[in-house]
Amino acid sequence: MALIPLSQDLADILAPYLPTPPDSSARLPFVTLTYAQSLDARIAKQKGERTVISHEETKTMTHYLRYHHSGILIGSGTALADDPGLNCRWTPAADGADCTEQSSPRPIILDVRGRWRYRGSKIEYLHNLGKGKAPIVVTGGEPEVRELGVSYLQLGVDEGGRLNWGELFERLYSEHHLESVMVEGGAEVLNQLLLRPDIVDSLVITIGSKFLGSLGVAVSPAEEVNLEHVNWWHGTSDSVLCGRLA
């Protein structure tokens, strides 16, 4: 399905929150957290279930953001549940006109336990068509299987299986030359990074006009989080919040 045109007033709201060129002292990429949630802060009806929350207007926005980032990061749970393509279908010429590998961000899959496979995925399918890039897979040690076409980035994890976020983004910047990364999920990843104003530069959150219920997967960090430089956009049925971690 073709994307609908991006609203100009939405593009204007997003402009101050888009990646900026790094200066010579930069060690980290520009990091944007972006996701869609329901009115009760759920991003899925239940764990492992793909759930549509946002309107077509904000779907176009997602691809617009992908166009402006060099990497796109998700956890393995999201990769397994949704089998996303993680490519970009928006271009300045015309929405969806020239979906290419060059215009798409580099997929980054956090797969500490080695659950996800590139072969047979939508990411592989789109890469083979020349419409998306091959992924970087982040592992907690030496991967059991090394798949052709995949770049692997090994990181140590703590006793709870959590990654060192600072080291991860430093290495994505220095070793893979990614100057900007958008993080799309899942909940565990978002909840941890919402507590890292030292890493996260921008937030773009879509709020859909629905409730998903108490069984849904919530984005709710362990501590209070305040935002600053907040702007809102209101569409047909969604609202978009743009801001920065205080």
From Swiss-Prot:
Species this chain originates from: Eremothecium gossypii (strain ATCC 10895 / CBS 109.51 / FGSC 9923 / NRRL Y-1056) (Yeast)
Recorded family membership: Belongs to the HTP reductase family.
Keywords: NADP, Oxidoreductase, Riboflavin biosynthesis
GO molecular function per UniProt: 5-amino-6-(5-phosphoribosylamino)uracil reductase activity; NADP binding
InterPro entries per the UniProt record, alphabetical: DHFR-like_dom_sf, RibD_C, RibDG_C, Riboflavin_Biosynth_HTPR
Keyword NADP attached: yes
Top-rank taxon, per record: Eukaryota
PANTHER family hit by this protein: 2,5-DIAMINO-6-RIBOSYLAMINO-4(3H)-PYRIMIDINONE 5'-PHOSPHATE REDUCTASE (PTHR38011:SF7), DIHYDROFOLATE REDUCTASE FAMILY PROTEIN (AFU_ORTHOLOGUE AFUA_8G06820) (PTHR38011)
Catalysed reactions, as listed in the record: 2,5-diamino-6-(1-D-ribitylamino)pyrimidin-4(3H)-one 5'-phosphate + NADP(+) = 2,5-diamino-6-(1-D-ribosylamino)pyrimidin-4(3H)-one 5'-phosphate + NADPH + H(+); 2,5-diamino-6-(1-D-ribitylamino)pyrimidin-4(3H)-one 5'-phosphate + NAD(+) = 2,5-diamino-6-(1-D-ribosylamino)pyrimidin-4(3H)-one 5'-phosphate + NADH + H(+)
Annotated function: Catalyzes an early step in riboflavin biosynthesis, the NADPH-dependent reduction of the ribose side chain of 2,5-diamino-6-ribosylamino-4(3H)-pyrimidinone 5'-phosphate, yielding 2,5-diamino-6-ribitylamino-4(3H)-pyrimidinone 5'-phosphate.
Pfam families: RibD_C
NCBIfam families given in the database record: ribD_Cterm (TIGR00227)
Chain residues that bind NADP(+): 78, 82, 163, 186-190
GO biological process terms, semicolon-separated: riboflavin biosynthetic process
Protein name: 2,5-diamino-6-ribosylamino-4(3H)-pyrimidinone 5'-phosphate reductase
Subunit structure: Homodimer.
Pathway: Cofactor biosynthesis; riboflavin biosynthesis
Enzyme Commission numbers on file: 1.1.1.302
